[in-house]
Regions:
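C-terminal and inter-domain tail/linker signature
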Residues: 1-337
Length: 337
């Protein structure tokens, strides 16, 4: 049996079409005509939460579009589904990819390159009664910094690159999908989350064997700038999962606000998902003794009964600011570091 989220998908696609061609004050009008009452927008630091179309346009969209000329939305994943977190009541539409443009003007203290630049993004939109009532738009600002030659963090353990979409090139689900496939994907995501929630197998299984319970051997972890991307279970364990687990204490799971799947793709976001205290070593940073929140989006591709790819968006600027390190301030003070 197919799931039909065509109405919600088309609404979001129409919104993107209008937003992406709007300029200046037109952006506010597009936002106002598509968002509902009591709207809330959640974005990464320094934008955080916004609830007014005019303010969202002024604070985020207009400055970004002024900096990134001739912007193109290059989607790699487009799905919709019902939210497991509220008992499968609400419908959300998810878009992931890059916003590409000519980086011609300063943005957030980052000096322009006058060359192509890509902002990694993933956006969850809740659709109710013909309007978008809630948005989580997470994006990788440090990735833009690295593209223009800045070094916001110490050397990362994974690879830096403009990240591609799914290996299968089948992430744009504009049409109806078999509901059973989405259920399988959600089950695979849930199994993985529960299996590692307390890192409970650390003393029972080698990390690579624990990961094999959820992941394909040739899995790809597309991590954010500052951590980087890694390929195969063994390299993922070596270059991210192992160091990450060893670098924190007092790990608290705060849960998610939305979790859904459609076809072979799915994901979730939280605000925040995790609270952790650094013990030293993560991203080359020292221990602070301060708990910090991580706002995260995870998107997945399933293959068979296991996960094959994972795209991750972490608000590292927000996390490190809580630890006393203001990356944006550093960049503004030393724009050609």
């Amino acid at each position: 049996m197919n799931q039909n989220f065509q109405k919600e998908k088309n609404l979001v696609l129409d919104y993107y079409k209008a937003l992406d061609k709007a300029e200046g004050d037109e952006i506010s009008k597009v936002l106002s005509s598509h968002i509902g009452k009591d709207y809330i927008w959640r974005g990464f630091h320094p934008f955080n939460e916004q609830s007014d179309a005019e303010e969202l346009s002024k604070v985020f969209w207009q400055p970004f579009r002024h900096a990134f000329k001739n912007m193109q939305r290059r989607m790699d994943i487009f799905i919709a589904g019902k939210n497991q977190i509220d008992g499968f009541e609400s419908v959300w539409v998810v878009s992931m990819g890059h916003l590409m443009g000519l980086f011609d003007n300063e943005w957030l203290g980052i000096q322009p390159s006058r060359k192509m630049a890509f902002l990694r993004y993933c956006e969850f939109n809740k659709v109710q009664d013909g309007k978008i009532t809630e948005t989580a738009m997470f994006f990788d600002i440090p990735h833009v910094m690295i593209q223009v030659g800045l070094t916001p963090f110490p050397p990362q353990t994974g690879a830096h690159l403009v990240q591609p979409g799914p290996m299968t090139h089948e992430g744009l689900l504009f049409d109806e999908q078999d509901a059973a496939e989405g259920e399988k994907t959600l089950a695979s995501i849930n199994f993985m989350v529960e299996d590692m929630r307390d890192w409970k197998h650390t003393n029972e299984l080698p990390l690579v064997d624990e990961l094999r319970r959820s992941w394909k051997e040739d899995m790809i972890w597309w991590g954010p700038a500052g951590i980087g991307a890694t390929y195969t279970i063994e390299r993922y364990a070596e270059q991210h999962s192992g160091p990450f687990r060893a670098s924190f204490k007092d790990r608290i799971s705060n849960g998610h606000l939305c979790k859904l799947a459609e076809g072979h793709f799915g994901g979730f976001f939280g605000w925040p998902n995790l609270t952790l205290t650094p013990t030293g070593g993560f991203m080359g940073m020292p221990a602070t003794g301060k708990p910090g929140d991580m706002r995260v989006i995870d998107m997945y591709r399933r293959e068979g009964d296991k996960l094959a790819e994972n795209w991750i968006f972490i608000d590292l600027l927000h996390f490190w600011k809580q630890q006393g390190v203001d990356i944006l301030e550093r960049i503004a003070q030393n724009p050609r570091n």
